[in-house]
Amino acid sequence: METPSQRRPTRSGAQASSTPLSPTRITRLQEKEDLQELNDRLAVYIDRVRSLETENAGLRLRITESEEVVSREVSGIKAAYEAELGDARKTLDSVAKERARLQLELSKVREEFKELKARNTKKEGDLLAAQARLKDLEALLNSKEAALSTALSEKRTLEGELHDLRGQVAKLEAALGEAKKQLQDEMLRRVDAENRLQTLKEELDFQKNIYSEELRETKRRHETRLVEIDNGKQREFESRLADALQELRAQHEDQVEQYKKELEKTYSAKLDNARQSAERNSNLVGAAHEELQQSRIRIDSLSAQLSQLQKQLAAKEAKLRDLEDSLARERDTSRRLLAEKEREMAEMRARMQQQLDEYQELLDIKLALDMEIHAYRKLLEGEEERLRLSPSPTSQRSRGRASSHSSQSQGGGSVTKKRKLESSESRSSFSQHARTSGRVAVEEVDEEGKFVRLRNKSNEDQSMGNWQIKRQNGDDPLMTYRFPPKFTLKAGQVVTIWASGAGATHSPPTDLVWKAQNTWGCGTSLRTALINATGEEVAMRKLVRSLTMVEDNDDEEEDGDELLHHHRGSHCSSSGDPAEYNLRSRTVLCGTCGQPADKAASGSGAQVGGSISSGSSASSVTVTRSFRSVGGSGGGSFGDNLVTRSYLLGNSSPRTQSSQNCSIM
């Protein structure tokens, strides 16, 4: 086909060869040729425009169809993501409330721990003070015992001296008795001498009377004779008689005076000797009595001091016994508190270790999810580039956040793990349900499976021969313990059945050892039942373990942004067909009403299972999330079943709202 530009030189060449042209003609011809060229170009342009419009119409039709398909897919994904975001917001709210409550409980526990620690420190100070006081009292007791031993030795010495003094007193009393006897003898002799003196005086008077009578008789005879004698010789006889009488009287008086003097001298000498000996004896007796009195006074004072010391010693011993009893009680209390604190600390360490393990597992899951989200983001970006679609600002923002998060995860994985550990919390709690229909109740069940404790709460003895304790953990085989045929549980008594692995001693009727079983078993759902001899269940206790996990709101918001980014993306195969893209969905059972909440979007193809287990003190939600993407043969497609993860969320406090006020319904 010949173009107008190819035809124009031929025509102009022919005209130029036929006739000469004027400049005006030439100018017009050139303008004509220019117009023809422009017309040809316009025709070609119009043809091209028409063909392009036809192609554009076809493309618009295809674009419209593609946009309708994409809008349908995006609307479905958006609905699913909005439902998912609603559930996530509710979960975040509940998790935030639970975290606040757990923080309050943690602060209370820390305050209690500080208070108990302060009390323990105070008790230890009191114990040290009591020990110091005990040492002082022991030193005082030793000094008092030394003083008592000294007083006892002095008492023994004084008792020896008293014994010697008593011997001396006995000797002196014997000497005094002998002196008294001698004094009595001397007094008897004096009385005898006085009697003799009186007798001699009476004899002397009698002799005087006799002599006077004889003298009168002689006088009378002489007078009668004188009458007869001469008066001349009367005076001679009278003078001679007077002289003889005077001489006889003088002799008698001299003899009596001499005898009297001898008696008085002998009596006075003996009396002086007796008085001197009596004075000596009385002085000795007085000294002995005085020494005896002083000894008695000293013995009385020492006895009073000894009794006072004995009373003080008894009081000190009673006080020492009281202090020892109080010290023993304080030691027992301190040991019990320390044992409880050590047990609580061991439990807290075990729980912390368990939580750290769970945190590590959750971090690993989070890292895997971050890698999968990053891979999904790359796939979506590849599809957008292939379809030449401009990314939304949210996608760009999410892509920037994902790139920064990826760099942080690659460059500082330990920092991310540490931040995750600090921004999330997990707690394991146990809830117990007990029921009793008889006298005996299941009082305590060990979480580690070491023992089962029963108590007779009635005022009567209970025969438990051939009774059974049945223990089961979830779907595990049933464990049965049978009591001895003659076993009886006293009123108010407690019996503990130990597993053989607990290391307890068999001491009936308070401690029994199940030698056939090393442990009672441990797990998340322990049911212990007491069966009587007729096969009737009279008591039951169920122990349920719940795990509570709380994550920081910032991390959840980042996950929400990543989910929003996934909502706004789309996947297509290389041939233009939409790929099946199954993101997250969740099925949750209400802990109060028990009804499921179906929030999965239609056409998403996600299959997620969840359940809630609620007890008297804790509730938990197990959420399983599945991701599946089936792409075409494009370079950005993935295989099936990328990841399936299970999470355990929960609230340690029981739900108090009714089914009408259920947040899910």
From Swiss-Prot:
Residues 243-383 are annotated as: Coil 2. The modification Cysteine methyl ester is found at C662. Residues 384-665 are annotated as: Tail. The modification N6-acetyllysine is found at residues 32, 78, 97, 108, 114, 123, 135, 144, 155, 171, 180, 201, 208, 233, 260, 265, 270, 311, 316, 341, 417, 450, 457, 486. The modification Phosphoserine is found at residues 5, 12, 18, 22, 51, 66, 71, 107, 212, 277, 282, 301, 307, 390, 392, 395, 398, 403-404, 406-407, 409, 414, 423, 426, 429, 431, 458, 463, 500, 546, 570, 573, 613-614, 617, 620, 629, 633, 637, 653. Glycans are attached at S626, S629. The modification N-acetylmethionine is found at M1. The record marks T266, E330 as: Heptad change of phase. The record marks D325 as: Stutter. The modification Phosphothreonine is found at T3, T10, T19, T416, T496, T505, T510, T548. One of its GO terms (biological process) is muscle organ development. There is a cross-link at K201 (Glycyl lysine isopeptide (Lys-Gly) (interchain with G-Cter in SUMO)). Residues 648-662, 663-665 form a propeptide. Belongs to the intermediate filament family. This is Prelamin-A/C. It comes from Rattus norvegicus.
